[in-house]
């Protein structure tokens, strides 16, 4: 929830050492008409509380829910930028232990590149803005979209994310899901099964790392271009203040969180998977990307259209409804 002062205060009093925050991200994902002033004030209070406790020897970590709450597809760049903004807001208030969420989209190449760039680029901007003294963590979430009701399909989803996490090898945390996720509140037994499955996959891939292939390097390059473009625009619009810049960018549509429920999102940016399952920009709206970024995304989407021979809207509907819909040729 974007308004969590009482909840977090009670949690800390009960022994909780980390909590999720997001003055911008949780507002966009979970509220239709909540003012940024209210949600950011709440996040700033929690960050100040975290910093105050840190100074007194109680280590409290804050995690940006930079993509996890959305529950649909997103590009690594959109998620990374949102995480940077959330963590800068927290660092400004004195929080020292900061975590970033990452929800794999189930394309190994894009996800490995995204995870690596998320840590590197977030550190870059925190350092640049004067917050080099923070400790940064990563938390991989096992898919926050619609879970299959079929338990075997759900287990396959959990296993695939676990494999991505294992081959990335640098995340400090993972939010484990269960095969009952698509049916309702999981039982204690179902939670235990999810943990066993995750640990088994992690053990199988123990000691292995996904190599820096040409494909990973290419994906890393495009992610960095997209992130730097959006961050440059946000900093310019805020005259160096990331919070003011983000609010102005959202109003102008030069940054968007596609498919979010908030009325503060213009809704001109749309995303779709390409033929490999990687998430691309279908429409870039008002985001000031350079021509090479727009063309790269366009080519990837057009190739899928050519191969599948289906209407764009039907493919998009599949992408939003399932993790990866079965391919049925017309």
Each language-model region and where it sits:
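Catalytic alpha/beta active-site cores
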Residues: 1-93, 97-101, 107, 293-330
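Residue-identity detector for glycine
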Residues: 11-15, 22-23, 51, 57, ...
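Electropositive, surface-exposed helix/loop patches at the edges of structured domains
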Residues: 56-58, 129-148, 210-233
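Acidic, glycine-enriched catalytic cores built around paired aspartates
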Residues: 170-330
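Structural signal for hydrophobic packing residues in well-ordered secondary-structure cores
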Residues: 12-15, 19, 47-57, 123-126, ...
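Long alpha-helical, hydrophobic tracts
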Residues: 37, 58-193
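General structural feature for long, well-ordered alpha-helical segments within catalytic domains
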Residues: 3-7, 42-49, 79-86, 114, ...
């Amino acid at each position: 929830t974007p308004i969590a002062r009482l909840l977090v205060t009670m949690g800390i009093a009960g022994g909780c050492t980390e909590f999720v925050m997001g003055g911008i991200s949780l507002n966009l994902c979970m509220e239709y008409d909540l003012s940024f002033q209210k949600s950011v004030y709440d996040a700033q209070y929690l960050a100040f509380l975290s910093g105050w406790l840190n100074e007194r020897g109680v280590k409290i970590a804050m995690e940006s829910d930079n993509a996890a709450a959305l529950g649909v597809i997103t590009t690594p760049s959109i998620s990374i930028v949102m995480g940077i903004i959330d963590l800068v807001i927290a660092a400004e208030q004195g929080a020292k232990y900061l975590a970033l969420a990452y929800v794999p989209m189930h394309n190994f190449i894009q996800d490995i590149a995204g995870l690596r760039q998320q840590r590197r680029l977030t550190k870059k901007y925190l350092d640049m803005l004067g917050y080099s003294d923070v400790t940064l963590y990563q938390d991989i979430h096992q898919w926050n979209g619609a879970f299959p009701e079929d338990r075997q399909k759900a287990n396959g989803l959990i296993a695939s994310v676990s494999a991505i996490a294992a081959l990335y090898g640098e995340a400090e945390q993972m939010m484990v899901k269960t095969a009952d996720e698509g049916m309702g509140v999981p039982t204690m037994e179902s939670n235990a099964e999810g943990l066993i499955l995750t640990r088994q996959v992690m053990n199988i891939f123990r000691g292995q790392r996904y190599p820096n292939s040409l494909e990973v390097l290419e994906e890393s390059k495009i992610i960095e271009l997209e992130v730097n473009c959006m961050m440059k625009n946000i900093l310019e619009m805020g005259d160096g203040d990331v919070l003011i810049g983000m609010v102005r960018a959202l109003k102008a549509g030069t940054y968007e969180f596609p498919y979010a429920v908030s009325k503060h999102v213009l809704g001109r940016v749309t995303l779709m998977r390409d033929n490999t399952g990687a998430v691309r920009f279908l429409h870039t709206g008002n985001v000031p990307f350079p021509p090479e970024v727009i063309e790269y995304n366009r080519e990837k989407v057009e190739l899928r259209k050519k191969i599948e021979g289906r209407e764009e809207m039907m493919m998009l509907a599949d992408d939003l409804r399932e993790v990866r819909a079965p391919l049925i040729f017309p």
